[in-house]
Amino acid sequence: MTTNYIFVTGGVVSSLGKGIAAASLAAILEARGLKVTMMKLDPYINVDPGTMSPTQHGEVFVTEDGAETDLDLGHYERFIRTKMTKRNNFTAGRVYADVLRKERRGDYLGATIQVIPHITNAIKERVISGAEGHDIAIVEVGGTVGDIESLPFMEAIRQLAVELGRERAMFMHLTLVPYLAAAGEVKTKPTQHSVKELLSIGIQPDILVCRSDRVIPANERKKIALFCNVQEKAVISMKDVDSIYKIPQLIKAQGTDDLVCQRFGITAPEADLSEWEQVIYEEANPTGDVVIGMVGKYIELPDAYKSVNEALKHAGLKNRLSVTIKYVDSQDVESKGTEILEGLDAILVPGGFGDRGVEGKILAAQYARENKVPYLGICLGMQVALIEYARNVANMEGAHSSEFSKDTKFPVVGLITEWIDSEGNVEERTEKSDLGGTMRLGSQLCHLAKGSKARELYGNATVEERHRHRYEVNNNLLPQLEKAGLKVSGLSADKKLVEIIEIPNHPWFVAAQFHPEFTSTPRDGHPLFEGFVKAAGESVRGELEK
């Protein structure tokens, strides 16, 4: 199969939404029957984002095969059906590490290792490898044109475009077209300078996507086309919208997909966007409202919980409910008490690391349990629910996780020293293992217990969900917890690790060790989130059994 490439770059400022724009174009092309994949090239020196602070970088998105990747891959999976893998995201750090490893082995036969050709060749090889088997590969380069870190990536895609030829490669560039109230007009000069910077690298954009808070007038689009050397019809106006799921229709209406198909000589049926029209309709026509409290430690940057936020919205679509997320700092729960949780229709405690704010999360789980408020715990959110239950129901005074307390008498959560990975290999870890890439990662099989809420929600005896953790339920203390009424409703493939817990005498209390948010999409939702938001809606209407 011959693969065609669209390289996506950004200019003027960061955070323009390259990932959303690229994913939206991918969604349209997929809706035309084409097989599409996406890639994100990150210029930072970290090997992957696994050890980066969520408040700096946002969430770490985990793929099926266990890669810790940029959050943009979450956008990709929410917009297209193709599942991302470790081939779909790589960093400068990963590339340099691979090249240096080869140099140490002597693979380069004594050559002087340089950015050109060794680093650029390594980048090109990864891009070609990741695109195999698809009609179109959309490749997003992180950062902003002009950044010193991104230069090797820019040079690599420039070379690749030359090698592939115009009939197989094109460039899409996102820029900002600001509106100046004092002048009463949009300004195109930043876009002109951004394209000039791109041209200095040797890249001529074929499509310009212009971000603005309003529709860019035709005369300004004509001006941009003239000074940036692109066709007028290839200047796409992307105004701010109240939902990212409207973007596919917005750029489809301007014929962006036709430009791509014409360039590559592809004959494909018109895009069927009926699924996206349904998503937009459901989003615009809720029949009720719910307020979900998210109790976490990284709330100053909502992107730290990006997939959770989106999964809650998706569940709202499926239940025809408008979901408002109220972010609650778990440290505030510690200092101000659980009174700040009053009025919430449901409580969610997401994943996290470190002991800061953990007691606040435990208090949130206790509040939800005692007040019959729907509760969903994810990863650490399951562990704190378990700790709370052990302390206050199973009479295990001082119970804790060994992650936070080494001398607790009841370590109900402990370090996993051994488990079976997704390929059936035994993984072993100790407290001395590196932080990066050493967790239980990726998609794992889970057995669901008969008669459990989890099995009712999923409608299957087994499911596969994605993990990212190194601590688990201590099986030695599990009998005491089960005797006190805790229900284990999900077990790992070898039935040695607890994956889901429930509290039977509670209207809706479910917690999972895995991350269900990574597989939720606007078109399909996710069973756990749908059940959780449905319970929140029933709580509002007074229909939830107490």
UniProtKB/Swiss-Prot annotation:
Its EC number is 6.3.4.2. ATP binds at S15, L16, G17, K18, G19, I20, D72, K239, D240, V241. CTP binds at S14, D147, I148, E149, K187, T188, K189, P190, T191, Q192, K223. Homotetramer. The active site is at C379, H515, E517. SUPFAM superfamilies: Class I glutamine amidotransferase-like, P-loop containing nucleoside triphosphate hydrolases. InterPro entries: Class_I_gatase-like (IPR029062), CTP_synthase (IPR004468), CTP_synthase_N (IPR017456), GATASE (IPR017926), GATase1_CTP_Synthase (IPR033828), P-loop_NTPase (IPR027417). Mg(2+) binds at D72, E140. Residues 1-266 are annotated as: Amidoligase domain. The gene is pyrG. NCBIfam families: PRK05380.1, PyrG. Pathway: Pyrimidine metabolism; CTP biosynthesis via de novo pathway; CTP from UDP: step 2/2. Residues 291-542 form the Glutamine amidotransferase type-1 domain. UTP binds at S14, K187, T188, K189, P190, T191, Q192, K223. GO terms for cellular component: cytosol. It catalyses: UTP + L-glutamine + ATP + H2O = CTP + L-glutamate + ADP + phosphate + 2 H(+); L-glutamine + H2O = L-glutamate + NH4(+); UTP + NH4(+) + ATP = CTP + ADP + phosphate + 2 H(+). Catalyzes the ATP-dependent amination of UTP to CTP with either L-glutamine or ammonia as the source of nitrogen. Regulates intracellular CTP levels through interactions with the four ribonucleotide triphosphates. Allosterically activated by GTP, when glutamine is the substrate; GTP has no effect on the reaction when ammonia is the substrate. The allosteric effector GTP functions by stabilizing the protein conformation that binds the tetrahedral intermediate(s) formed during glutamine hydrolysis. Inhibited by the product CTP, via allosteric rather than competitive inhibition. L-glutamine binds at G352, L380, G381, M382, Q383, E403, R470. This is CTP synthase. GO terms for molecular function: ATP binding; CTP synthase activity; glutaminase activity; identical protein binding; metal ion binding. Keywords: ATP-binding, Glutamine amidotransferase, Ligase, Magnesium, Metal-binding, Nucleotide-binding, Pyrimidine biosynthesis. One of its GO terms (biological process) is 'de novo' CTP biosynthetic process. CTPSs have evolved a hybrid strategy for distinguishing between UTP and CTP. The overlapping regions of the product feedback inhibitory and substrate sites recognize a common feature in both compounds, the triphosphate moiety. To differentiate isosteric substrate and product pyrimidine rings, an additional pocket far from the expected kinase/ligase catalytic site, specifically recognizes the cytosine and ribose portions of the product inhibitor.
